[in-house]
Amino acid sequence: MPVSPAFNPQDALRFLPEIILTVMGTLLMVLDPVIHKRSSNAFGHISLIALVMALGASIYAYGIAGPAFGGMLMVDGFATFFRVVVITVGILTVFPSYRFLARQDAETSEYHALLLFSIAGQCLMAASNDLIMVFIGLEISSIASYVLAGYLRDDKRANEAALKYFLLGSFATGFFLYGVAWIYGLTRSVNLSVVRGVFQHQPVDPTFVGIAAALMFVGLAFKVSAAPFQIWAPDVYQGAPTPVSAFLSAGPKAAAFAIFLRIFMTAFEPISDKWQPLVWTAALASMCIGNFAAILQTNIKRMLAYSSIAHAGYVLVALTAHSETGVAAAMFYLAGYAFMNVGAFAAVSVLTGKGERYQNIDDFKGMGRKQPLAAAMFTIFLLSLLGVPLTGGFFGKFYIFKAALDSHLIWLTVLGLLNSAVGAYYYLRILVVMYMYEPGEAADAAEPLAPSLAFALILPALGTLALGIFPGWVLEFATKSAANLK
């Protein structure tokens, strides 16, 4: 469908979530000299207001869905779904950040501004229908995330995490951009709809097409921490502040998968035979490396990092299915994953104590008695990550493996189920430590649960259970959005 390049006033309304987040992020930095440091929680309140406004704007924009800015953006159900997911991740990240920033006596305005800028980039990624816009959104999100990872400037682990994240992330972005250059050279366009049309109706050298797809796959696989490009994730998740680790594990990953799905299921859909074997291999490698490496970990944050690699593999299984059902399953899974993983890291933020001193799994002995609410919420998140019924994780995995079976991916489904069984060991090990051992030093040093941290635990737990008990409405919207993804 041809799209007029002329400006339409509705374009600004369709772009409203990104405008709100950018303006409010800038406002936070402008207000920094004005607001007294003792009132630093005000920056968190402003950040929450901005995110709620952006959430409302995303829902409003869906009511006037359509292309914007000459077709560079596409505000549809797919974009709205992922906008809501990444903004929700931002809201859930703000709550544990209150206590973290107060404990560290860190600057709050810059932290929340970077958070808003990163989410703005992720929203742009979700709505992009043009490879240049994808790149811009990717860079906005990534640059802010690099700084957040090293936000504690006096912490050597945080500095190391930020440096590794920046260097490897820049390298991966180079691969992605080089792939974009190949696509432009082959099709004379960076618009996804036009690229799809060229691949469908014009002869293109299959070797060059395969190279372009592989280059872009490498760049995106890094962003979602999929094997064999996952090496950065454990060090970054361990070294970054725990609320930042929660954010990085869910928000940027969901946005990157939105790009993955939109590019590979629209522009690259006619050449699926070129990329399906690559995605199949990455899915299996991610599940195996993530789950088996997680078994060996003693640090809770590194364990969750390897767990996130395995979960990236599950989503890649849905992409390998190459079907509307697979896309819908991936969308549902990422929504559930956002709740359970942000919640898990929020629980870790509580249970590791002041300064995150107690990060070893053995330090969690007896936490079920000393921190009953945090331990109970952590249990819900771990069971959801495992895929136990009545949680969002169960239905997420069920829909993914069903989509894989429908596409006759028998071996990948079997291997995925076996990997899920392997995951039971390291998730249940934490529950055993928390509930079946006498309290240790960390449990004895436990502090009262702050209201902001209680919210950070209860809200994602409710989301996780809601998706496990009433999955239909989210899956229905995801299915409708996937059907319109062209």
Swiss-Prot record:
Bilayer-spanning residue ranges: 15-35, 46-66, 72-92, 111-128, 131-151, 166-186, 208-228, 241-261, 276-296, 303-323, 331-351, 375-395, 410-432, 455-475
Class of enzymatic activity (EC top level): translocase
The reaction(s) this protein catalyses: a quinone + NADH + 5 H(+)(in) = a quinol + NAD(+) + 4 H(+)(out)
Signal peptide per UniProt: none
Keywords: Cell inner membrane, Cell membrane, Membrane, NAD, Quinone, Translocase, Transmembrane, Transmembrane helix, Transport, Ubiquinone
Membrane topology: Multi-pass membrane protein
Keyword Transmembrane helix (UniProt): yes
UniProt KW GTP-binding keyword: no
Subcellular location: Cell inner membrane
Any single biological process term in GO: ATP synthesis coupled electron transport
Free-text function comment from the UniProt entry: NDH-1 shuttles electrons from NADH, via FMN and iron-sulfur (Fe-S) centers, to quinones in the respiratory chain. The immediate electron acceptor for the enzyme in this species is believed to be ubiquinone. Couples the redox reaction to proton translocation (for every two electrons transferred, four hydrogen ions are translocated across the cytoplasmic membrane), and thus conserves the redox energy in a proton gradient.
Quaternary structure (record): NDH-1 is composed of 14 different subunits. Subunits NuoA, H, J, K, L, M, N constitute the membrane sector of the complex.
Family per record: Belongs to the complex I subunit 2 family.
Name the record gives this protein: NADH-quinone oxidoreductase subunit N 1
UniProt source species: Solibacter usitatus (strain Ellin6076)
Gene for this chain: nuoN1
